[in-house]
Amino acid sequence: EFVLIKGLLNKFDYTVSAGYTEAEDCSDFTTKYLKTSIENIFQQHGLRPVQEYMRDKCDKNLVVVAPTGMGKTEASLLWLNGEKGFYTLPYVVSSNAIYERIRDRYEYKDVTILHSDSMHYYFEDQVNETDSDGYEKYQKAKLLSQPLTICTVV
């Protein structure tokens, strides 16, 4: 219990210190925008077996082992089912690619990226007009307040 309370107090302290009044941005619980977007795109050729399995088992804890190209990324996003999630990858380049895929292909705006170079990444997006306020997105990523955070293993 102590760790949970300490973690919440730290999060609230960081949130208020950053000038925000809310610790969490609205989640995808009710609209399930990301899940719906993925299903709509895959409607033409259908979900792969691993994607169907994870979508149907979203109330279970799962470990998925599958070769490259089997659809694990979308399967994990379907498994989230609108819940808050952290998608962790080993490399910055991989994190950037998955972030862009989720943001652009599925038009999901409630995703942030957090790694050693994410501040630079957000400012680059701001310069390229992909994002309007890079610093604010970076702060929200650091607060872990968005429904989906793409990050690297430290």
Predicted segments with their positions:
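N-terminal helicase ATP-binding lobe
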Residues: 1-154
